[in-house]
Amino acid sequence: MVAISLSFVLPPPPPRYTVPVAYAAGAANGMAVPVVETNNILSHPEGGCPLQVGEGTYELKDDLHLATPPPHPSEAPIINPNPLATVPTPPTSGVKVSLVCVSPRSKTPSFISKQIVTAPPFGDGNPALVPAPVKDGLKRRKPKNNIIKSSSSFVSRVITHEAATKRLSERSPEGLFAFANINRAFQWLDLSSKQKEEPLAKILFTKAHMLCHDINEVTKSPSHIDMVMGSSAGDIIWYEPISQKYARINKNGVVSNSPVTHIKWIPGSENLFMASHANGQLVVYDKEKEDALFTPEIQDQSAEALKASSRQPLQVLKSVNSRNQKTNPVALWKLANQRISHFAFSPDQRHLAVVLEDGSLRVMDYLKEEVLDIFRSYYGGLICVCWSPDGKYIVTGGQDDLLTIWSFPERKIVARCQGHNSWVSAVAFDPWQCDERTYRFGSVGDDCRLLLWDFSVGMLHRPKVHQASARQRTSMVAGSSQYGNRHRADSAGNRMRSDSQRTANTYESCDQAVRHPVEPRARTALLPPIMSKVVGTDPICWLGFQEDCIMTSSLEGHIRTWDRPREGINDKYNDQSSSPAVSASAAGSGSVSGLAESTMGSL
């Protein structure tokens, strides 16, 4: 009987996928996996996988399948046939894509162009962070090392296209560049080229996998692109693809020896970027500073002080206001002992939304190095997060197969979105289909599905059974939002002494984060998708919206592109007076819910 009861306690083994997961483990069914590198494959499916929505049909334009590189010869395969074994495998993230247009687009979403940023730069007021004057005027600094001629053991080899210079000189500056990782390879692609399957450059790393990457929108130009990428080893690469120069940051984990889970340039900054690590740390780096062995700047090392600081939602191990800014890190914060899954900067360039594997969403004022609010998932960890273009809403996705919409001004949950059958891996807003009243966002997940969602506040209704108690609870949360919005009393002068000088009593008094209880599902509005579609046979890892298309990438390297409906339909849809989505929201939730239900029913 004991054996029978244990069989119900043990969780089922995780799903096993043929190429990437077996590649990470080095074996499948106890046998070494023969992975042979091939060229990228570009296909144009005819009439396959259209996306039907109110404004028209999104047609699948092409499917670019990235080649999976073979393991490095020095990488011994780990034979592990037991699916329940606890031996850790190298972290993987699937294929993530960074897109950049080096020339300003002719059109920008009107919803985005109305936003006005008034926040000061990160680190403003600290003279130690004032950048040194540039000798060459407006000329951008580049990394020092040539990655093609590199003798580093971290980089295995670099393959460049034989006609790369010619292709770069002849291409339109309005075309899209794409940067994508697949296992230990990192590819630079020109999506505007007829030979888009032929990378301009491919970097093969020795053992580390690139898990995340980002492009600096401030410094980009036709002759310069600043990119940072984080690896499974914790090392970070600053890469300039046009000159093929690079620099290695956090070398051998000298600052943080944990895999980089997400990385983003700090909005408006030319040099500073933020990286989250699997050990629960958020680190701000300067691409032009050298590394040094990191020691927390905490003067009071007593057991009482350390115990008090560990209970805080944010431990400032090095403040951005520290005068010690000769080397990296610029700032280092500890949020938890568990993995940070993802983070996103708000459009006002002041707030930061962070999701963790412990199931928490933490909203920070990162300029003040403070956690304002802590929300919890319904079940399991949170995986992805994004802000609406106007900064009013935050959307998260996680292991509970749900998406959750949070109102940032009101500091409360707005709705839960049910439609995925597995973990939600990525979420993003479509700024070209958003206006002041209606929002469009999309999500992808391990169920191989792409879902699109429309919502407005007027179309969301709580369940009638709990409306009375819900109204009472809303007033309570609204009161707490005023508490969450309050201004802190500490001045810039006091903070210049560094948060690391706080004592135990100071830690007890400064924990001002509002911890919101979990809202029961029975009291929460439920939003169905307007479109749900299985778009492949392997989990989807990334989702991006462009002016003329929707793009996804998958675990096994498929980058798919859907063209938006033709211009006439889109122009009509973007007109607020004739928008089907706005009309539906004005009419109430019935028509929108009915549309979503009929869409789901036909799948």
Swiss-Prot record:
Region entry Disordered, spans: 470-515, 567-603
InterPro entries, per the entry: WD40/YVTN_repeat-like_dom_sf (IPR015943), WD40_repeat_dom_sf (IPR036322), WD40_rpt (IPR001680), WD_repeat_creC_regulators (IPR051362)
Keywords, comma-separated and alphabetical: Repeat, Transcription, Transcription regulation, Ubl conjugation pathway, WD repeat
Composition bias, Polar residues: 470-484
WD repeats: 255-295, 335-376, 377-416, 419-463, 535-572
Record's GO cellular component terms: cell division site; cell tip; nucleus
Keyword Transcription regulation: yes
Amino acid composition bias (Low complexity), ranges on this chain: 577-603
Pfam families: WD40
A GO biological process held by the record: carbon catabolite repression of transcription
Function: Component of the regulatory network controlling carbon source utilization through ubiquitination and deubiquitination involving creA, creB, creC, creD and acrB. Required to prevent the proteolysis of the CreB deubiquitinating enzyme in the absence of carbon catabolite repression. CreB deubiquitinating enzyme stabilized in a complex with the CreC leads to the expression of genes such as those in the proline and quinate pathways.
Family from the record: Belongs to the WD repeat creC family.
Subunit structure of this chain's protein: Interacts with creB.
Cross-referenced PANTHER family: AT02583P, WD REPEAT PROTEIN
Name of the protein in question: Probable catabolite repression protein creC
Organism: Neosartorya fischeri (strain ATCC 1020 / DSM 3700 / CBS 544.65 / FGSC A1164 / JCM 1740 / NRRL 181 / WB 181)
Name of encoding gene: creC
